[in-house]
């Protein structure tokens, strides 16, 4: 029996590998394992809660330097005194807002996710880009197409 979904997942894993995007490669391979085992019963939960869990893990990793003391509080306070840091804060606020629009768009139009993934992988492979978050890319798409 020919499974086109499995073929697509394998192609995405291959693109991730070729483009040195280990996050895509590992993610797709994990999804293949889930798909081909009894763990597939977890797909509804992953589809519903996956982005939230991922954002929580990402937030933990971003805040870890503050919690560990690697980023001293004095550095945080100085961020409000330097114009470059203030620009970084403004960009951070904008990107967070954009990511929120991306989450909404990906939830309302899941077909866009494949395009974002392929675009990210191609950008990494062909233009030596770095795999930026698909949430931000989805946010930009939402601004361009006027959705969410």
Swiss-Prot record:
<keyword id="KW-0472">Membrane</keyword>
<feature type="transmembrane region" description="Helical">
    <location>
        <begin position="86"/>
        <end position="106"/>
    </location>
</feature>
<dbReference type="GO" id="GO:0005886">
    <property type="term" value="C:plasma membrane"/>
</dbReference>
<dbReference type="Pfam" id="PF04284">
    <property type="entry name" value="DUF441"/>
</dbReference>
<feature type="transmembrane region" description="Helical">
    <location>
        <begin position="112"/>
        <end position="132"/>
    </location>
</feature>
<keyword id="KW-1003">Cell membrane</keyword>
<dbReference type="InterPro" id="IPR007382">
    <property type="entry name" value="UPF0756_TM"/>
</dbReference>
<feature type="transmembrane region" description="Helical">
    <location>
        <begin position="51"/>
        <end position="71"/>
    </location>
</feature>
<comment type="similarity">
    <text>Belongs to the UPF0756 family.</text>
</comment>
<keyword id="KW-1133">Transmembrane helix</keyword>
<keyword id="KW-0812">Transmembrane</keyword>
<feature type="transmembrane region" description="Helical">
    <location>
        <begin position="4"/>
        <end position="24"/>
    </location>
</feature>
<protein>
    <recommendedName>
        <fullName>UPF0756 membrane protein ESA_02180</fullName>
    </recommendedName>
</protein>
């Amino acid at each position: 029996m020919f499974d086109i979904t499995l073929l697509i997942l394998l192609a995405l894993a291959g693109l991730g590998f070729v483009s040195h995007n280990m996050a895509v490669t590992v993610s797709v391979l994990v999804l293949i394992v889930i798909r081909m085992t009894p763990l597939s019963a977890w797909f509804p939960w992953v589809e519903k809660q996956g982005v939230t869990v991922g954002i929580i893990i990402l937030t933990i990793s971003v805040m870890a330097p503050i919690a560990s003391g690697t980023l001293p509080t004095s550095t945080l306070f100085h961020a409000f005194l330097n114009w470059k840091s203030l620009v970084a804060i403004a960009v951070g606020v904008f990107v967070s807002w954009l990511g929120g629009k991306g989450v909404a768009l990906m939830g309302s139009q899941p077909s866009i996710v494949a395009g974002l993934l392929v675009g990210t992988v191609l950008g990494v492979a062909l233009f030596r880009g770095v795999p930026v978050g698909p949430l931000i890319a989805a946010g930009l798409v939402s601004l361009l197409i006027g959705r969410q």
